[in-house]
Amino acid sequence: MKQLIITADDFGLSSGVNAAVEQGWRDGILTCASIMPGATAFDQALTIARRNPGLQVGLHLTLVQGKAVLPSSQIPDLVNEAGEFSNNPVACGMRYFFDKGLYKQLKQEIEAQIQRVVDSGIPLSHIDGHLNIHLHPTVFAFLTELMPRYGITSFRLSRERLCHNLRFDRERRAGKTIERIIFGALANHARPILKELGIRYAGEVKGVLNSGRMTEGYILQIIEGLSDGLTELYFHPGILPDTEITRRMPDYRHADELAAIISPRIKQRVAELNIGLENYRGDRKEYA
């Protein structure tokens, strides 16, 4: 049996993202959304989540290219005076690994992001990360301590088959190869620890190598070759015009990704292939 988790990232980033998430849940195959607690439209995202209780919400942990939850005075080595993390993921990754002086502030911010969602009353069941920062070895070590404490039972294990991806999209071959090596190694490190903790994860995650380009045509191709078991597809849907979306991700095809989520062709093909739609809790979504 094949099952699909369909997730929208960046929930709370902007009104355009939030509107797309709600439309994807109501009219499409979306089953989950990953929320950014420090983002400007976080409160609006909570309102949408409350009026759509079947939509499962996870934490989109943000430690790069975004805003912190804690005040800058409390984590001055992580953010600038405006409370913003660096926009350079490589520099962040190196600092978070080698600079042990950051560890206390880093753990405080990670827990604060979890706590902000928990305090909202929205059930929080899974964790992923902006630019997959949740797999960073230092960050992951803190998460393995915090997830059991907060009852978080699922985790995005960001690994994707390179050969399957390149069969349908041969752009960025060098970049995808590097990403596959890096995230593959990080996933291999995390997997046995997640197993030991009893944390659920999908066998494969689609969206790692085609982030921002999860279009209808691409999705129709890749669902034909899904592995048995649980697969997650993650998207970055948005409704334009939206200055926050285009400022942060000018090359992402947000409208096309929303179109894929609500595509009647994709919904029909998923049903024909007898692929189940569910969230990380295992709740099934019925075909409309």
Regions found by a protein language model. Name each.
Residues 2-5, 15-126, 137-288:
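Terminal accessory/targeting
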